[in-house]
């Protein structure tokens, strides 16, 4: 993941010191692009160990259209606990918007299903997008979406995806985001009988929290290792029928984890 290390180095070199909502403060740049060729390996960070179970279970949670952390907690995943209310709900975030986007007329739109239909029937469409940024629901969300819009592209029977992320916690969040969308591309490619192509990532406010800067400096001293491979062990009848046990990461040999405090 040389792209990730290069990004950290740039933020440290030219980033702007900014105040932020959490009170922690950030070193920030505006506008950045990265590209990952999924044919060359699964882009799971090797310069520190990532908790792959959290990544997979969170993605499956989104795809269920779920917005209550009960499913995550049942599977010993706590990454959303800080934002849940007393009932375990986090508001109409990713899962709600992906699977049940509410219209002013009271209808609900399943954006993921619509994309799957287009990929199978009209793969040259330029309208294969999913948005999590529902302006009418923002005030109801415990944490508004950071990764807000993604688009699919098919050429030569190969599936690529581009993500726009308005706000990016580079040290803690970004490794999860890259891996999560790469898994999603693999899943959708399998369901649509396509090969995997590129994952393109675009960030808006791309930042290191001030309490992560020294940790990031430690991380960039580590030389990236060979990327692992992602294998999906079976093909369910539907994108929404995958389970954690269907995924296998082969050849993941990361450096030890570097723990950082999350800013809320």
UniProtKB/Swiss-Prot annotation:
UniProt cross-references to SUPFAM superfamilies, sorted A to Z: Thymidylate synthase/dCMP hydroxymethylase
Presence of keyword Hydrolase: no
Pfam families the UniProt entry points to: Thymidylat_synt
Gene3D superfamilies xrefs: Thymidylate synthase/dCMP hydroxymethylase domain
Compartments, record wording: Cytoplasm
Any one Gene Ontology cellular component term annotated for this protein: cytosol
GO biological process terms held by the UniProt record: dTMP biosynthetic process; dTTP biosynthetic process; methylation
Residues that hold (6R)-5,10-methylene-5,6,7,8-tetrahydrofolate according to the record: 51, 169, 263
Keyword terms of this UniProt record: Cytoplasm, Methyltransferase, Nucleotide biosynthesis, Transferase
GO MF term (any one): thymidylate synthase activity
Family named by the database record: Belongs to the thymidylate synthase family. Bacterial-type ThyA subfamily.
Role summary: Catalyzes the reductive methylation of 2'-deoxyuridine-5'-monophosphate (dUMP) to 2'-deoxythymidine-5'-monophosphate (dTMP) while utilizing 5,10-methylenetetrahydrofolate (mTHF) as the methyl donor and reductant in the reaction, yielding dihydrofolate (DHF) as a by-product. This enzymatic reaction provides an intracellular de novo source of dTMP, an essential precursor for DNA biosynthesis.
Protein name: Thymidylate synthase
Taxonomic source organism: Buchnera aphidicola subsp. Acyrthosiphon pisum (strain 5A)
